């Protein structure tokens, strides 16, 4: 972000390299489908490698895996509680058409951050490179919309902060449903894929981000369905930093302004969440 734009945002808010190193084995087993990510050449001994920093289990850690939990924070639908919970080896995010966020033109059921202990969590700061891998199950009831439906975000913590990167379900004027990754700060589309073939099945996600200001950042986004690579796109020279730090969010965050009639009661499942730092 430019110095002038950062100053404006700072006042308003109060205040990847596409690496080729392969994922390290962490020994974790899950009942839900495991990650099946693209093979990559082994790095030379002198190069940086991905270091496992976070490997929660839904079964044993539950919602304690995350820094914060935003379950109906406006208390709009007490009868629907809990909207976010662990079930077996998965984390489930349930959303109903009657749910409302604190801004009543939208809905939100999300978790944030990577908790590593009762009072500790990982902080993604400027100059660092991080990688998140997981599997997600998108049911056919979780449809793309003509306005925003985000199922992953990268944000600066704090009230009112704008998203930096979003993974979204978007419906175009012709009704086509896609899943996309976008650099929200500068509204740059990194990549997209058809959503219909990914409905009602597990999809593997591999997201990498170098946290950098102005043009110092980068991202890489990979989706796999079984053994098929659905999308593998990178963007360098990207602005991936606002201030303080970057924190990931998962769940369902969507606008009520959809004009396609696609909003209905639905859910999202996540499993096999892993966090790595390039070091």
What are these regions (language model features)?
Residues 1-9, 27-30:
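Twin-arginine (Tat) signal peptide motif
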Residues 2, 9-22, 35-279:
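Low-complexity, Ser/Thr/Pro/Gly-rich disordered linker/stalk regions
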């Amino acid at each position: 972000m430019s110095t002038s734009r950062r100053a404006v945002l700072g006042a308003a808010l109060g205040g990847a390299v596409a690496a080729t190193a392969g994922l390290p084995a962490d020994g974790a087993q899950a009942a839900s489908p495991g990650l099946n990510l693209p093979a990559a050449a082994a790095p030379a001994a002198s190069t940086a490698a991905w270091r496992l920093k976070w490997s929660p289990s839904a079964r044993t850690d539950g919602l304690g895996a995350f820094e914060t939990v935003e379950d109906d924070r406006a208390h709009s639908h007490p009868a629907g509680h809990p909207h976010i919970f662990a079930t077996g080896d998965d984390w489930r995010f349930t959303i109903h058409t009657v749910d409302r966020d604190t801004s009543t033109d939208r809905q939100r059921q999300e978790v944030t951050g990577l908790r590593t202990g009762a009072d500790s969590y990982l902080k993604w700061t400027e100059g660092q490179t991080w990688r998140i891998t997981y599997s997600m199950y998108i049911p056919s009831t979780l449809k793309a919309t003509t306005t925003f439906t985000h199922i992953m975000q990268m944000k600066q913590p704090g009230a009112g902060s704008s998203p930096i990167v979003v993974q979204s379900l978007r419906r175009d004027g012709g009704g086509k449903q896609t899943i996309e990754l976008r650099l929200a700060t500068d509204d740059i589309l990194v990549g997209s894929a058809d959503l219909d073939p990914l409905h009602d099945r597990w999809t593997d996600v591999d997201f990498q981000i170098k946290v950098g200001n102005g043009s110092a950042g980068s991202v890489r986004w990979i989706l796999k369905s079984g053994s098929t690579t659905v999308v593998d796109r990178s963007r360098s020279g990207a602005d991936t930093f606002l201030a303080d730090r970057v924190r990931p969010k998962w769940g369902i965050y969507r606008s009520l302004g959809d004009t396609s009639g696609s909003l209905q009661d639905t859910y999202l499942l996540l499993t096999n969440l892993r966090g790595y730092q390039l070091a």
